[in-house]
Every structure is written in C-alpha cells, then in structure tokens.
C-alpha cells in the first residue's frame, strides 16, 4: 500500500473570520456629541445637510425647566472640529401655531423628519396642547425649520378651533327705567365669570344704549376674564328717556362684530340683548334683525319685567318683541325675569346654553375625535406628502393622517372597525404608534401602521387610504406575545435597491425571552406578489438578556458594498442599560439571520446609557463619500463612520516544492537540515468609492506546525513562530514578502509541514479600511515530503518475510508443555528485495495462550525495530523508519512465554509486513507468514486419599458390640501445585460394596463435596461371580474383581494455582455380613482414578492419576472362663472390701466431730 505523493502538490487551506466580528462601522473612533441627559438629549437623531453644512440633529424633548418641558432640537456640526459642541436651536421658544399663549410641556423633538430637498426639516411636538373651556387637548404640532434653522410655519392638521371660539356682544339697556343698576352690574360680572375669555376662545364686547347706542368696550379690548369683570364693575349707566333697542341691535350686528372692533371672522357670533321695556323704534327692528341674520349672529333675548310690574302694566307686547329679537327656538334663546335682581338667577342657564353652541367648522363631525390625536408622535415622509400617526385619536384607538399639499386625509372612526372592533375601542390600541409605507411592483403603494396595544399583543396593518377616506386593508399582522409591543417600530427595506420594498421588519421590543428577560424580537417579513407579507424568521440578541431589541430600527444604504441595503437595530437595555447597536446585512432574499456587527456601548471609549434608542443612517456626514450612522443615547448622540472595505487575495509559494526525506542541503543549529523559502503575496482590491487613502498597513505572523507537539521545522533565526511583521499594501497592487525556514526532523514524513500565516489590517495609528467578509484572515500551506524512488518517483518494493518456531506439534501428536519448559522462540527475518519501502511496518498477532517476552535482534544492525502494543496479543512494529532501504535485511528473535491462565490447544504466531510504497500483487504472498503447533499441558497435580478407618475387628455373635458396624470417611484430595489454571478434571471412585447374593458388606451413605459435582452410578459387575461369604477364607482381598462396586463420578470445578479440591465419601460397615462369614483377615481395596474430560488440553502423568484406600477387616474368637474362678474372684473382692472398711474405722474416719457451740452447750448442761 502506498500513500500517493506528488512533488509539486500544494494544499492551501483558507480560514474565514466569523460573522459577528467587527465590520466596517468604526466603533473605536466614534464621534461623540454630549448633551443634557435630563432633557432626554438623544431621544431622536436625524442626519441633515443644509446651508452648505452637514449636521446631526438631536432631539431633546424634555428640554426646559421642570413644569415646562417644551423640548428642543440641537444641531451638532460634523464637518468642523471634533470637539465642537452642539448648539441649541431654541425652537421651543417660538410661537407655534396660531395660539397666543406659549405652549408648555409640548416635548418638541420627539420626532424629526427630513423635508424634500430644501435643506429644511420638521420637528414635532406631539404633546402640544391648547385649552378649550375647562379641557386641554393635545392635538400635537410640527414645526417647519429652514436651512438656516429658523421656523417657517407649523403643521397642526388636527388642531381645531375650540367649541368656545365665540365673539359675544352684550346689548345692555341703560335707560332710566333700569333700576337698581348695581343688580345689572352683578349680572354682568357673574355672566362674564362663567365665560372662558381668551383671544383663542371667547371675546366679549358691550353696547349700552338708551336714546343712542354706545360701544362701552369692543371685542378685542380685553384679553382676560379679570379685565372684563373689572370693566363690568366700573360700568356706569348712560340713562335716557327712550329705549331704542332696534338701533342698538343694528349697531351691534353691523359694527360690534366687525374686525375693526376686534371681531374674528371664523368665530361664532352671539348677541345678548338685555332690556326692560318695549323699544321706541320698533319699526326699525326687522331691518336690524335682517342685518344680524346676514352676519350669522345668534341672538339671546332677556326681558326684565321690573318696570312693568312696578307700574302694573301689561307686558304682553314687550314680551312679543323680545321673542322676535331672540333666535328660534324661544325655549333656548328667550329669557324673562321679574326684575333686575332676578337677572342673576338666569346666569347659569344662560351660560350652559351658550356653551351648548359649537364653533363654525367644516368638519364638525370629527372635531372631538381628533382632539387628542398627538400629531407628530410618529411621522413618515412620502413622495407626495407626509404620513402622520394619530396615536391618541378616537379615544386612543388611534388612526393615521395623510397630509398632501395642504389637504388632509384620514379615515373616519368606523372605517377600520373590521380590524379594530368597536367593542375593543376602550382598550387603547394606539394605532399610529408607528407609520411607514411600502411600494410594491407595479407602482402600488401601501401605508403601514402599528397598533402595539391591540388585544395587548399588537397589530400591524398594510392598507390603502383613498381620497374619500375609505380604507382597504391588504393584510394585517398579529403579535404573538402579550405585552411585547409588536408593531411599535416598522422598517421597510428595499434590499436590492430597485425602488420596491422587499422586506418589512416589525419590532416587538418588549418580547420576553428565556428566563423572562426582556430581550425583544424583530420579525422579518418578505414582501411578495402572491402572498403579500410572509414571515421569513426573527432576529434577536444572543445570548438572551434584557435588551429591548428593536426599540429603534433604521434602513441603511449598502454599507458593505455587496449591492444590498442593510439595516440597523437598537437594543438600548443591553449590558446593564448601556445599550448596543446591531447591524444586519441584506440579501437578495431578505436579511441575514446573524448580525454582521454588534457595537456595544460598553466597548466604546465613553460611558454611555441607552445607546441605540434612536438611529438614522442615510447620508455621508464626514465628507469621505461613505455613509455614516447616527445613534442616540441618554444624554449623547454618536456618529459612527463607515470604513472602506478591501478584499485581500493571499498566496503562498514554497521553494523547493517538497522536503527531501534523505538529502540535507544546509546546516542549522549545528545539524544537517533541509532549507526552504516561502513567498507570501497579497493582492488588494476594493469596491469602495470615495476619497480615502488607498495605501494602508497590515500586520502578519507566521508559524510552522502550530498545533503539532515537537518541533520538526523552524524559521531561520527564530523558532516555530515568526515575530509579527508590518507590511504596507496598496489597492490594485500585489505586495510580497520572503520567509526562510528549515526542517530538521524528517522521520514523520507522512504529515506535511504546515506553514500558517495569519494577518490583519493595522489600524492602530488611524482608522483605516477593513477586510471584506469574504476575505481570509489566514492562509496555510502544507509542504509535503519527497521520496527517493527513481525518475518515475514511484517506489516499487518487494518485502519478504520468513518465520520459524522451535516447537512442533500436530493434532494427533501434540507437543506437551511440561513444567521445565515455559518458553517458545520464533525467529523472524524481513528483507527488502527492491526499491525503498517507506513507513515499513510489521504487524504481529499471536494466540491468547502466549505472552511476548522480548524482541531481540540476532545480529548488530543499524535498522531499528520499534514496537507498540495496540492490544495484549498484537504488536505493530516500525522497521527502519522512515525508510527500509533497498537490499536491507533484518533478523530478530521473538521470545514468548506460555500463559498460565489461558490454555488453548494450539499456539500460533502471524506476521504481516507492509509499507507506504507500492508492491505488486505477484510478490504480496510472502508479506505474510504464520507458524503454529498443537499442544497439550502437563499440570503439576497431587492426587491423594485418606481414610478415618484403616482396621476393623469383627466380633462373633453373643459379644459386644451388636448392630451395624461403624461409619467412616474417605477423603479424596486434588492439589494444583503448578501455574496453570486447571479445569475439566474428573474423579472416578470404585467402592467395593456387595458380595454374592446381594449381601452388602460396605455401603455409601453420603458424598460431601466442595467445588465439585458428584453423581452415584449403578453397581458394577465383576469379571467373575461375586465372592460368597463362606468362601472368604480362600481370598484375602475384596476389590472390583470379585465384588460388585458402588461408583461415584465427580466433576471438579476450576482449580487455580495453589488451590485444592476435596470429595468426602461416608461409608458404613455391615457387621452382620462379616460375622456370618468365615475368614480370619482380609483387605477391602477402594480404587480412585483422576481423569480429564474428552478433548481436554491437559495430559496427566500416571503418578497423578491413581490412588487407593485399604481397610483391613479381622475376625476375633471368644475366650472361655471357669465358674470356680468367677466365684473365687467375687469372694476375694468382698473380703478385701471388709478389710478396708475396718482400717478406716480404726482411724476415726467414721467419727462425727462436734462444733464449738455444741461443746459449750454440753459443758453448761454438765454443770
């Protein structure tokens, strides 16, 4: 077998950088513009070019003192010095709208919008409010600002005149009949006190008349309620003998409401006539009333009957005149009181009826629905106007408004009831929280608006708004999680920049991720023709943390010059509210799911909070023709500059192309080595346009066998790693560098030497270009080893292997392994008869009953044989590594020892020689050699028997003992005195038991075993007839030849070295048999044989196979004794006993000894 080598082979491997590594937004050199954090400076940002300068506009909607957060917009110069501060625009100080009062807490700057190509912009204050009666309505307003940063009007498309926008002229009878005048003054003061007097609400004028009318004060004379009350208090009666009411009404309707007297053309006109008598010019009354009708004047008539009642006159004619003066119906516009004092009683009723009137408006039906619309909360520029979100319209259900050329268009309240059911109108869906639009193929445009609180999950609708206010919803998108604020931010994206929308991004910044973290999520929808919006996937921060990812989003031009637009997503709560900005690259089919860059505020040189709360990236602000990105933070605005993108094409060429295994051409560190030179080259290209320095520096470092233990190669004058070097590159050119290295160790020629170069652009001194995403950051060259194999560079070898074992054994005549021999020798010879054999190896496999003790070369040889043990019964040996050269021959001796634990019937040794060189099939048969022999083992066993009864005497009848004879035990013992683990042994016991006629003389009563299994077989039949008891006197032995024997066969368990096993046989002697028999002495012979199972690898010696147990039985005769001898013996015994008793008596043995108390008692009795 050969591993193919080609001398000119190169194997370059390129390693790419990760997707989340920093890309071409320069986060290390940001442009920071600080501002007041308490003003929420950074809430909104807008890139702006106007007046020949580049600015970054920053909204500070909470700017101003506490209680008057008017808000403002700061302009931060970008083209000038880096430390130039931001200038406050003071836009909040201007009078916005037609209000005469300065707005407070309007929060100007919450949204900023670039206007069409005039260098101006629009700043919105959604909380701009105006008072209407006792209510305050936040309709919102947007200020138009020109290129010189001066307000040029405002937009308040939902701001409407208050219902109390009225001009009220009081025509007061001051003739002599009015009495008392103080009651009239009180009536005037109380009536004025109920009116909301303000230049934007109610103005009051007064005409007093008697004989002639007089303008006491005109409509525009007083601006506050206090001024009018003061004038009413100081009003004097004109007096007069006549009451010319018609003339006064004519003057009031023709002069009092005129602009010269402070009248407002758009205000509602109310005339209040107070008189106590019928007019003296009644014939002129129809003309006066006609003039009032022409001037759209609504008339209240108040008849004071005090003069008539005091003189007891009929007031009918007077009341008819006053009813004629009052507008219809009389129930609403006519009053009569009994006297002057009673005027104060109708003040409340009159005030209520006045406030029941509304101003004159063209769109009266929607005035109250848009009062809290908060225009400017969200804005979107269209080609033909501006799209506003009206988040507070329709009781906070929300809506949108399209302003086109001064014409406003918005859907009526019920136009969206299919999407936003009226039953849920109190849930505050906040439609208009975000607005945008998308352009489909074919030129069709759809408006987009988010309602993040709809059903608490959020909703986005794509719709068309027609000229008549009708709405056609093309598709709606629903949020998936309660409280996620789905739809709070919308970002349509034209990825391929063909003018049509390809992707819609919908943010849910409060989406709860794992571990209840407020991670946020952005949903990516593909825009299609068949299915309008199809969910492609989601974007979210990793790992999960509190982020509010998607709080701000901004479409970006093609930052990475790949032809597709990109998008930025803010996450202001990341890293403990420091914030982060994510950059995603667009593709032909959408948006890449992983961020190309994450810019964390924590990694910036300035401490920031809530970085990423707003973002805008459309223009080049620093003048390098590259798009920059503006990002808002708490109290700061940051400008991130784009950096040029270059693409590096590295190459690495090595000379010579391969490393010689045998030849060395130089000396390094005092050793022979192979020297090589590598040419490292870089070709630089770039698609980045603009004015930037096309020359830059790069740092690189090189290493040899970086991940390999042990140094095979090193750089000249250095080690395995080369110190970092700096190289100057230029776009459009190829720059090269020479690297010199050498190889000392060629033994591991299979693995090429790996030369690895890693590189990166050097931007330590100034911001420079970045590498394209497709550019490598390292290159590796694998330099192979070459072989000395002739002109064809192909080594053809012929390995010949011969083996010889010093034992022989066949199946019929196996070799017996006896105790004196424990080893077997195998002589091995390996020879190479052709070309070099590289990486020659010898595989050795041997049977489990062998242990390799040693491998010894037979003669001194320069060829090394080194072996490793992949397993207990295999070896893998390298021979002459790395090259087993032509004609080489090596002989060595393998010494094996027989295993004591594994006993097999055969030993074998198999050897196989191989190399990486090529060997023809015709010579492969001698690459393998095997030798084997059949064997048996002679174990060292000791087989013995011992008995507890060796001789037994049989007593005749009439003597003791009587009954059966004794029970005795014969113990058989097998001891393993060798090293082998022996198994499969069998003990066969032949126990003589039965004589002629089935008479038992011995019988087996019990078998006691330990580590053995025994069975008792049938009685054996002797070669001849069993011996008869009467004939025992003619034989002296009982054995298996003349008796029937009991046979016990025991299979012994495994017997380890130094252990033993025993079998106990309990037998009973039958006295009855031997008492009847005629004999003097005989021997019972029990025979025991130790054998092996069939097919066993054991071979037992004769000495260890047999054992005997002998029992000698002897019959005794009775001895007769004379009767006189017995009688004499008894009498002699009795005489001897009497003599013994007499002697003891004489010695006092039988005398009773008294105790001391008894002696004393006897002495006393005697006395």
Curated annotation (Swiss-Prot):
Report a single Gene Ontology molecular function.
integrin binding
- Disulfide bond entries: 76-86, 666-675, 681-736, 789-795
Cell location: Membrane
Glycosylation site positions: 98, 234, 336, 364, 733, 763, 839, 921, 1011, 1018, 1039
Which positions fall inside the VWFA domain?
A: 167-350
Record-annotated residues binding Ca(2+) 3? 620, 622, 624, 628
User: Entry's PROSITE patterns?
Assistant: FG_GAP, VWFA
Q: Among the record's GO biological process terms, what is one? A: cell-matrix adhesion
- Signal peptide range in chain numbering: 1-22
> Where are the Cytoplasmic topological domains?
1146-1167
Q: Which residues bind Ca(2+) 1?
A: 494, 496, 498, 502
Query: SUPFAM superfamilies this protein is in?
Result: Integrin alpha N-terminal domain (SSF69318), Integrin domains (SSF69179), vWA-like (SSF53300)
Residue positions annotated to bind Ca(2+) 2 are 558, 560, 562, 566
Which cellular component terms (GO) are annotated to the entry? external side of plasma membrane; integrin alpha10-beta1 complex; integrin complex; plasma membrane
Which keywords describe this protein according to UniProt?
Calcium, Cell adhesion, Disulfide bond, Glycoprotein, Integrin, Magnesium, Membrane, Metal-binding, Receptor, Repeat, Signal, Transmembrane, Transmembrane helix
Question: How does the entry describe its membrane topology?
Answer: Single-pass type I membrane protein
Name the residues that span the membrane: 1123-1145
**Repeat FG-GAP: residue ranges?**
24-85, 95-154, 361-412, 417-470, 472-534, 535-593, 597-657
| Membrane topology (Extracellular) | 23-1122
Q: In which tissues is it expressed?
A: Widely expressed with highest expression in muscle and heart. Found in articular cartilage.
Instruction: Give the record's subunit note.
Output: Heterodimer of an alpha and a beta subunit. Alpha-10 associates with beta-1.
Task: Report the domain remarks.
Answer: The integrin I-domain (insert) is a VWFA domain. Integrins with I-domains do not undergo protease cleavage.
| Known function | Integrin alpha-10/beta-1 is a receptor for collagen.
The similarity comment for this entry is: Belongs to the integrin alpha chain family.
Quote the protein name from its UniProt record. Integrin alpha-10
Q: Which organism is it from?
A: Homo sapiens
């Amino acid at each position: 077998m050969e591993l193919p080598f080609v001398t000119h082979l190169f194997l370059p491997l390129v390693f790419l950088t990760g997707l989340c590594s920093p890309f071409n937004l320069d986060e290390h050199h940001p442009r920071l513009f600080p501002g007041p954090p308490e003003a929420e400076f950074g809430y909104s940002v807008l890139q702006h070019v106007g007046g020949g300068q580049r600015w970054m506009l920053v909204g500070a909607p909470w700017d101003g003192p506490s209680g008057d957060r008017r808000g403002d917009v700061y302009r931060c110069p970008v083209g000038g010095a880096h430390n130039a501060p931001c200038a406050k625009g003071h836009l909040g100080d201007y009078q916005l709208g037609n209000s005469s009062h300065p707005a407070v807490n309007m929060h100007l700057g919450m949204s900023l919008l670039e206007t069409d190509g005039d260098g101006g912009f629009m700043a919105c204050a959604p909380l701009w409010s105006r008072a209407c009666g006792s209510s305050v309505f936040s309709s919102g307003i947007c200020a138009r600002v020109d290129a010189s940063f001066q307000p040029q009007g405002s937009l308040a498309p939902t701001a409407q005149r208050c219902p109390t926008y009225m001009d009220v002229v009081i025509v007061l009878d001051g003739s002599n009949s009015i009495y008392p005048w103080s009651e009239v003054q009180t009536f005037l003061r109380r009536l004025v006190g109920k009116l909301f007097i303000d230049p934007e609400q109610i103005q009051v004028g007064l005409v007093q008349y008697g004989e002639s009318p007089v303008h006491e004060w005109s409509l525009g004379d007083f601006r506050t309620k206090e001024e009018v009350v003061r004038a009413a208090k100081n009003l004097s009666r004109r007096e007069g003998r006549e009451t010319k009411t018609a003339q006064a009404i004519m003057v009031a309707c023709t002069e009092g409401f005129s602009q010269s007297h402070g009248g407002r053309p758009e205000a509602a006109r109310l005339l209040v006539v107070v008189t106590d008598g019928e007019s003296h010019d009644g014939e002129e009354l129809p003309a006066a009333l006609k003039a009032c009708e022409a001037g759209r004047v609504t008339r209240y008539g108040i008849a004071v009957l005090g003069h008539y009642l005091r003189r007891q006159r009929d007031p009918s004619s007077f009341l008819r005149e006053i009813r004629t003066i009052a507008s219809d119906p009389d129930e609403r516009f006519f009053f009569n009181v009994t006297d002057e004092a009673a005027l104060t009683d109708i003040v409340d009723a009159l005030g209520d009826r006045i406030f029941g009137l509304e101003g004159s408006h063209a769109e009266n039906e929607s005035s109250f629905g848009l009062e809290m619309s908060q225009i400017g909360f969200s804005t979107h520029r269209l080609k033909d106007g501006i799209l506003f979100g009206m988040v507070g319209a329709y009781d906070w259900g929300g809506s949108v408004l399209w302003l086109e050329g001064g014409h406003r268009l918005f859907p009526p309240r019920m136009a969206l009831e299919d999407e936003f059911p009226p039953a849920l109108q109190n849930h505050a869906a906040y439609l208009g929280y975000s607005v945008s639009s998308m352009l489909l193929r074919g030129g069709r445009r759809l408006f987009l608006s988010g309602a993040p609180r709809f059903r608490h999950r959020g909703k986005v609708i794509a719709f068309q708004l027609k000229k008549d206010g009708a709405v056609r919803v093309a598709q709606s998108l629903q949020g998936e999680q309660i409280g996620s604020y789905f739809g709070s931010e919308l970002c349509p994206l034209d990825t391929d920049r063909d003018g049509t929308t390809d992707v819609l991004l919908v943010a849910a910044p409060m989406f709860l991720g794992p571990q209840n973290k407020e991670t946020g999520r952005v949903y990516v929808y593909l825009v299609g023709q068949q299915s309008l919006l199809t969910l492609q996937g989601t974007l979210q921060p990793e790992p999960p943390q509190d982020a509010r990812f998607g709080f701000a989003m901004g479409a970006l031009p093609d930052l990475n010059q790949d032809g597709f637009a990109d998008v930025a997503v803010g996450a202001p709560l990341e890293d403990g509210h420091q914030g982060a900005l994510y950059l995603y690259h667009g593709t032909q089919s959408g948006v890449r799911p992983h961020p190309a860059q994450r810019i964390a505020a924590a990694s910036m040189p300035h401490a920031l909070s809530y970085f990423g709360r707003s973002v805008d990236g459309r223009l080049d602000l620093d003048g390098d023709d590259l798009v920059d990105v503006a990002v808002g933070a708490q109290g700061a605005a940051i400008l991130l500059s784009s950096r040029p993108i270059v693409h590096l094409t590295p190459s690495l060429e090595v000379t010579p192309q391969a490393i010689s295994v045998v030849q060395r051409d130089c000396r390094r560190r005092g050793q022979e080595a192979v020297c090589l030179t590598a040419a490292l080259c870089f070709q630089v290209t770039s698609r980045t346009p603009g004015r930037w320095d096309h020359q830059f520096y790069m740092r690189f470092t090189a290493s040899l066998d970086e991940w390999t233990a042990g140094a095979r190669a090193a750089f000249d004058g250095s080690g395995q790693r080369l110190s970092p070097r700096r190289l100057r590159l230029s776009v459009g050119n190829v720059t090269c560098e020479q690297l010199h290295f050498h190889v000392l160790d060629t033994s591991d020629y299979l693995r090429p030497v790996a030369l690895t170069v890693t590189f990166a652009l050097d931007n330590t001194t100034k911001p420079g270009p970045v590498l394209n995403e497709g550019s490598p950051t390292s290159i590796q060259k694998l330099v192979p080893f070459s072989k000395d194999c002739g002109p064809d560079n192909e080594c053809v070898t012929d390995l010949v292997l011969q083996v010889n074992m010093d034992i022989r054994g066949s199946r019929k005549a196996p070799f017996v392994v006896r105790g004196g021999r424990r080893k077997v020798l195998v002589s091995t010879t390996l020879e190479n008869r052709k070309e070099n054999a590289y990486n020659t190896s010898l595989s050795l496999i041997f049977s489990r009953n062998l242990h390799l003790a040693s491998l010894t070369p037979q003669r001194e040889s320069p060829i090394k044989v080194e072996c490793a043990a992949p397993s207990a019964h295999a070896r893998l040996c390298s021979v002459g590594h790395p090259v087993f050269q032509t004609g080489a021959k090596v002989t060595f001796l393998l010494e094996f020892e027989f295993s004591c634990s594994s006993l097999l019937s055969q030993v074998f040794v198999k050897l196989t020689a191989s190399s990486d060189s090529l060997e023809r099939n015709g010579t492969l048969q001698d690459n393998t050699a095997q030798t084997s022999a059949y064997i048996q083992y002679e174990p060292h066993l000791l087989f013995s028997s011992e008995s507890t009864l060796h001789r037994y005497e049989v007593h005749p009848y009439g003597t003791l003992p009587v009954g059966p004879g004794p029970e005795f035990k014969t113990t058989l013992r097998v001891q393993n005195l060798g090293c082998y683990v022996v198994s499969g042994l069998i003990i066969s016991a032949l126990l003589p038991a039965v004589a002629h006629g089935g008479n038992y003389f011995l019988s087996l009563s019990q078998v006691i075993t330990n580590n053995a299994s025994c069975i008792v077989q049938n009685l054996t039949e002797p070669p001849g007839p069993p011996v008869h008891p009467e004939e025992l006197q003619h034989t002296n032995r009982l054995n298996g030849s003349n008796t029937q024997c009991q046979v016990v066969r025991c299979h012994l368990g495994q017997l380890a070295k130094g252990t033993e096993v025993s079998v106990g046989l309990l037998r009973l002697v039958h006295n009855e048999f031997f008492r009847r028999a005629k004999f003097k002495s005989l021997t019972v012979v029990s025979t025991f044989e130790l054998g092996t199972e069939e097919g066993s690898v054991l071979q037992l010696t004769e000495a260890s196979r047999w054992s005997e147990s002998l029992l000698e039985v002897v019959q005794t005769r009775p001895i007769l004794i004379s009767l006189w001898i017995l009688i004499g013996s008894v009498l002699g015994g009795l005489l001897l006993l009497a003599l013994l008793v007499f002697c003891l008596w004489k010695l006092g043995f039988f005398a009773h000894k008294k105790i001391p108390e008894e002696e004393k008692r006897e002495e006393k009795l005697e006395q």
